[in-house]
């Protein structure tokens, strides 16, 4: 499989993608971040999003992918379930895992329901809208991406501002009180 048309021009990463594809629970893999939008440079990492029926254990992922990495932290949860790695050739790769059913409910809630969440509502939307499908066994990711190809709804914009404004200042859990 040749991923070059998707701005993946790294043989080591192609092997990782093929290894991920071999897992039964993996339904789709997409390229996100600057590599998917054309804004990357020679220092850019790869952001790989793996959509699964069930997220493989960190141990399974380490056994499958560890041989391709010179440095790796499997099973991090800073933002989502993720593996933060540097490939054997020195290229940094973040691999983010999403459960299809759970993520599908989240997308429905945001896009169809207009519900805002703290901080990352627009980031998730941008990610889905601009990611490149590397493979999609079931059509799941393509469905998510197609849902995101609409104009940003006014009710969601208003909900994001209202929801996140309270985090900035004036409330007990606001950021301004936390950093004092």
Report residues per predicted region.
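Helical scaffold of the NTase/Pol beta-like nucleotidyltransferase catalytic core
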Residues: 1-30
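Conserved NTP/Mg2+-binding pocket subregion across the NTase superfamily
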Residues: 2-5, 69-179
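A short alpha-helix capping/helix-coil boundary motif
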Residues: 16-17, 61-63, 154
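Accessory alpha/beta interaction modules
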Residues: 26-27, 46, 75-80
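Short N-terminal helix-initiation segments at or just after the protein's N-terminus
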Residues: 26-40, 133-141
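Catalytic metal-binding acidic patch
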Residues: 32-67, 82-97
């Amino acid at each position: 499989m040749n991923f070059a048309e998707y701005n993946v021009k790294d043989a080591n990463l192609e092997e990782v993608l093929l290894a991920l594809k071999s897992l039964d629970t993996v339904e789709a893999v997409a390229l996100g971040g600057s590599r998917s939008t054309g804004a990357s440079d020679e220092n850019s990492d790869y952001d790989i999003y793996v959509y699964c029926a069930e997220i493989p254990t960190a141990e399974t992922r380490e056994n499958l992918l560890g041989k391709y990495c010179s440095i790796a932290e499997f099973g991090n949860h800073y933002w989502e379930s993720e593996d933060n790695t540097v490939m054997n050739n020195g290229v940094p790769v973040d691999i983010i895992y999403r459960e299809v059913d759970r993520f599908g409910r989240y997308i429905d809630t945001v896009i169809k329901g207009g519900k805002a969440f703290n901080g990352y509502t627009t980031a998730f939307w941008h990610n889905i809208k601009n990611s490149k499908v590397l493979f999609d066994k079931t059509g799941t990711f393509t469905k998510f991406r197609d849902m995101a190809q609409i104009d940003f709804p006014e009710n969601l914009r208003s909900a994001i501002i209202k929801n996140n404004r309270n985090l900035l200042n004036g409330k007990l859990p606001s950021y301004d009180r936390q950093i004092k």
